Amino acid sequence: MITVSTDKSKLDIPFLQNFLKDVYWTAGRTLEEVQTTVDASFCFGIYLNDQQIGFCRAITDYVVFAYVMDVFIAEKHRGKGYSSILINAMMTEPQLQQVKIWRLATSDAHFLYQKFGFTSLAHPEKMMEKIVSDQYSVVSDQFKKNQK
C-alpha cells in the first residue's frame, strides 16, 4: 500500500542521504546537511508498505512562495506513477493552499511538473541568483564524468 506522509519523524534520513549523495543536483551532501535541510523544510515522504521509497520537500513561507526541492523516487520503484502521487500530495496539502507562487528547477522532469501546472518562467530575465559555494557543481561535474 502506498502512503504519503508529512511526519518528519517517519523520514529515513540515512535513506535520503544515501540517494542524495549520488545525484547531480546534491552530489556529496552529508548526513548532517540532509538533516538540516529536512529540519528547515516542509517534507513529504512516500512509503510502500511503510518502507520509504521517495521524498520531496518545499521551502516556504506558507503564504506567498514555495520552492520544490529534492524530489526523487528510489530507482527500483520508478515508472509506477509514484512521483505523481508525491507531487499531487504536495500540491493538495492543506497547509500549502495559500501559496501563490511555486518554483522549482529540473533538467529532466519537465513532463512531471507540467501535469501540475508548472511552466517555464514567464520572465527569466527578472530572476537572479547568487551562488556562494560551487561545492555541489564541482562534485556534480565529477559525478557526471564518472558516469560516462
Feature names for model-found ranges:
Residues 98-102, 107-131:
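Conserved active-site alpha-helix within GNAT-family acetyltransferase domains
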